[in-house]
Amino acid sequence: MKIGLFFGSFNPIHVGHLIIGNTMAETTDLDEVWYVVSPQNPFKKNQSLLHEFDRFDMVTAAIANNPKFRASDIEFSLPKPSYTVDTLTYISDKYPQHSFVLIIGEDNLDQFTNWKNHEQILHHYSLYVYPRPDSSNSFLREHKNVRLVAAPLLEISATYIRNLVKQEKSIRYLVSKEVEELILSRKYYSNY
């Protein structure tokens, strides 16, 4: 199987993440999309990051009804901070029967040369890139292992959602019903 790995904090997972995953699953040659919950992003501050298992629960709830989606906690047991190259190596060794593609936003492509061992990633894996606001035209767009995928340009931010929760405002339509129920019942983000 050909699997797209969609890494993220998913703090929380929102409809933008689901739309991108569905677009990748339905309009490319991918058989599945795995949402890889990152315990810690080396490029992001850790202040308002929910515990990894809580974020994994939200991802699992959000994607439960799509047979082409899978939630992965594979990075939880790997050394922190999590570097994509290390996870890709680990996951490829663990599942040699599959081929893997990295799903990233155009904003990440702009910063890709800052990633640990980015040349190794580009040599061994394809990048399926979806559009993001305020992205520049990275020279990597022309790389043979980079594929630009037409997808809706969405400006939904997890920070915005967390702020709404803190202000006790509705997050309906920004997250799935299942995720909204988890956030409200477990009081996620209320005091961040």
Curated annotation (Swiss-Prot):
GO molecular function, one term: ATP binding
Family: Belongs to the NadD family.
Catalytic activity: nicotinate beta-D-ribonucleotide + ATP + H(+) = deamido-NAD(+) + diphosphate
Keyword ATP-binding: yes
Pathway: Cofactor biosynthesis; NAD(+) biosynthesis; deamido-NAD(+) from nicotinate D-ribonucleotide: step 1/1
Keyword entries, A-Z: ATP-binding, NAD, Nucleotide-binding, Nucleotidyltransferase, Pyridine nucleotide biosynthesis, Transferase
Lineage, opening ranks: Bacteria, Pseudomonadati, Bacteroidota, Cytophagia, Cytophagales
EC number: 2.7.7.18
Entry superkingdom: Bacteria
Organism: Cytophaga hutchinsonii (strain ATCC 33406 / DSM 1761 / CIP 103989 / NBRC 15051 / NCIMB 9469 / D465)
Protein name, UniProt field: Probable nicotinate-nucleotide adenylyltransferase
